């Protein structure tokens, strides 16, 4: 029986078309999967980057708060604060020693806050990506650091007002103010600002360190 080469060619051509279409569909599926995997990898990589950014900002702010609370104020720091107060129009010469000291100490805390400004700006820069990737709880923990700084500055503002008060109630308030500014003196003392920083740092580490460290296990 003679072979119909024309029909055979049409047959194989049809098979080739089907196989070619199947290959295209398979390639499309593989390509789509590869793109999805690539996107997932990019998202995961971005999540790790943001986790590192948030933790770094938190560590910087925590260290900045510790720096602001340093109990030792060298003469140069006190003199610089006094000079700045005079430049701002506040004349401390002639004030009672207690009032003058209180104003200068207040100035020291504001100068320290200015010195560490970039560390707190790093926290503000991390808030938006933290909200996108990790939610409101992470943002609340981040905000604890600038809140602690602002609370300290509010307590510093009260130093001049409390410098000449001797009532028992005001003396108790003075103790609280100084704990706000310098931290606790004894382990059993209360330190609301310090505890808020510890709580925030613990929450961030519990949430984000596993994400950052996951790269070491890959």
Enumerate the predicted regions with their spans:
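Terminal, low-complexity, charged helical segments
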Residues: 2-8, 60, 67, 136
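Transmembrane helix-loop junctions and nearby membrane-interface residues
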Residues: 25-35, 64-71, 155-159
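Amphipathic, membrane-active segments
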Residues: 39-80
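Membrane-embedded hydrophobic alpha-helical segments
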Residues: 1-41
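An amphipathic alpha-helical interaction surface
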Residues: 89-218
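Short amphipathic alpha-helical/adjacent loop interface patches that line ligand
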Residues: 35, 58, 201
